[in-house]
UniProtKB/Swiss-Prot annotation:
Annotated keywords: ATP synthesis, ATP-binding, Cell membrane, CF(1), Hydrogen ion transport, Ion transport, Membrane, Nucleotide-binding, Translocase, Transport
Membrane-traversing stretches: none
Coiled coil: none
Official protein name in the record: ATP synthase subunit alpha
Keyword Signal: no
Gene Ontology molecular functions: ADP binding; ATP binding; proton-transporting ATP synthase activity, rotational mechanism
Length: 504
């Protein structure tokens, strides 16, 4: 029998000791001390980071918000009814991230990136943090490319550029969501990706929007992020950040994205609810002191990047719901000061049949003018002033009928302008057709057409141009410039000769 030498034994033991590895899995664990209404307070998470993801024993995730001396305030990102006092909550060491990438196109997801459309899981290979710094001054480029909404009153008087933030503001039931849907439909073949964020909407409403987009072939380039009215406040608060994080992935890859937040009033209300439950001190209208920062850090992430970074862009259309047209309330004034202009929708106009109910008097686009195509700039230059003058004269005209010829002509032109700026639901108009009809209007070709026939004149003119002078429309579409004025004039005059008014 072979004997083992003492030296060999010691070297074997030494070898085993050297090879021995132990991994200590240290977990920072806390205990829930209070829970309710989507908020939990936990004790014992001493090293937790602000905004860190935490996991409850039920498997539901939470996010650390209040870091206090003896407890941590946590917003619960999911069903909270199964969480009890005394439950364990542990750190994950990660901050909140959402899945991003082209795999999300055509899908409906919740603010955590989980699918809601019943089409199976979303297989994405990348994630992005929901909070990320906005591009700096040197990373940006001035807005210079147009974003065509397909809505005549907006594209002509309140133009929007790629990389702009344009607020859509108005009372409930004034057609805000309709503008969003029409704008998304109009991005077909425009090399644009759309993200529609529904915050606190009824699930039936979101379902209707998704169905409309599907029927129009617009869902294939759209991501829908939905936090419905039945979801807890923390999910409503997160939804816009999820939407913009998904958009940023495309922007940093040189693509153009349109993000619609419908609407930020509900996000602010959800944030107020969350903050009050977290015992944060209330300010004006019971909103917390940082409600401005809530929206500014979101909307600053919309940008037009410079060419070195790929030249991508995020255009943001935030919605705000006003109460009885009061734009001087807290949240509306905050968002007006953050954005690059606003489109104001008025319920009076809406109910009088002017739809979309855009009030050009107090609507403005601060940077869109430099993005408007030359043809539109040329034909619609005076449209806004003409309309403002008409509204002023309209008030005077009610007092007396003995008006001089020039005033009467202005009133007639104004009536036809208002009529022509009306548009049917989900019928966005290509920019070349908008230019053609606004040219006909501003050059006086509709002055002797009865107001009731203006819309028919418009549709028949488009049919005529498409079949007889399509090269004129093609020229506007491809170059952005007005064709030879004599050609456009001749085409409209030739059409007008054959146009029969209904009273003739």
């Amino acid at each position: 029998m072979a004997s083992i030498k003492a030296t060999e034994i010691s070297s074997l033991i030494k070898q085993q000791i050297d090879q021995f590895e132990t991994t200590v899995n240290v977990q920072d664990v806390g205990t829930v001390i209070r829970v309710g209404d989507g908020i939990a307070f936990a004790h014992g998470l001493d090293n937790v980071m602000a905004g860190e993801l935490l996991e409850f024993s039920t498997g539901v995730m939470g996010m650390a918000q209040n870091l206090e001396e003896d407890s941590v305030g946590i917003i619960i990102l999911g069903p909270y009814t199964d969480i009890r006092e005394g439950d364990e909550v542990k750190r994950t060491g990660r901050i909140m991230e959402v899945p991003v990438g082209s795999e999300l196109l055509g899908r409906v997801v919740n603010p955590l990136g989980q699918p809601l459309d019943g089409l199976g899981p979303v297989h994405t290979s990348k994630t992005r943090p929901i909070e990320s710094p906005a591009p700096g001054v040197m990373a940006r480029k001035s807005v210079h490319e147009p974003l065509q909404t397909g809505i005549k009153s907006i594209d002509s008087m309140i133009p929007i550029g790629r990389g702009q933030r344009e607020l859509i503001i108005g009372d409930r039931q004034t057609g805000k969501t309709a503008i969003a849907i029409d704008t998304i439909i109009n991005q077909k073949d425009q090399d644009m990706i759309c993200v529609y964020v529904a915050i606190g909407q009824k699930e039936s409403t979101v379902s209707g929007v998704v169905e409309t987009l599907r029927q129009r072939g617009a869902l294939e380039y759209t991501i829908v992020v939905s936090a419905s009215a039945s979801d807890p406040a923390p999910l409503l608060f997160l939804a816009p950040y999820t939407g913009v994080s998904m958009a940023e992935e495309f922007m940093y890859n040189g693509k153009h994205v349109l993000v619609i937040y419908d609407d930020l009033s509900k996000q602010a209300a959800a944030y107020r609810e969350m903050s009050l439950l977290l015992r944060r001190p209330p300010g004006r209208e019971a909103f917390p002191g940082d409600v401005f920062y809530l929206h500014s850090r979101l909307l600053e992430r919309a940008a037009k990047l410079n060419d070195d970074l790929g030249g991508g862009s995020i255009t943001a259309l935030p919605f705000i719901e006003t109460q009885a047209g009061d734009v001087s309330a807290y949240i509306p004034t905050n968002v007006i000061s953050i954005t690059d202009g606003q489109v104001f929708l008025q319920s009076d106009l809406f109910h009088s049949g002017v739809r979309p109910a855009v009030n050009p008097g107090i609507s403005v686009s601060r940077v869109g003018g430099s993005a408007q195509i030359k043809a539109m700039k040329k034909v619609a230059g005076t449209l806004r002033l003409d309309l403002a003058a008409y509204r002023e004269l309209e008030a005077f005209a009610q007092f007396g009928s003995d008006l001089d010829a020039a005033t009467q002509a202005r009133l007639n032109r104004g009536e036809r302008t208002v009529e022509l700026l009306k548009q049917d639901l989900h019928q966005p108009l290509p920019v070349e057709k908008q230019v053609a009809i606004i040219y006909a209007l501003t050059k006086g070709y509709l002055d002797d057409v009865p107001v009731a026939d203006c819309r028919r004149f418009e549709s028949e003119l488009f049919t005529y141009l498409e079949s007889n002078n399509n090269e004129l429309l093609e020229h506007i579409r491809t170059t952005g410039n007005l064709p030879e004025e004599s050609d456009l004039k001749a085409a409209i005059e030739a059409f007008k000769k054959g146009f029969v008014a209904s009273n003739e």
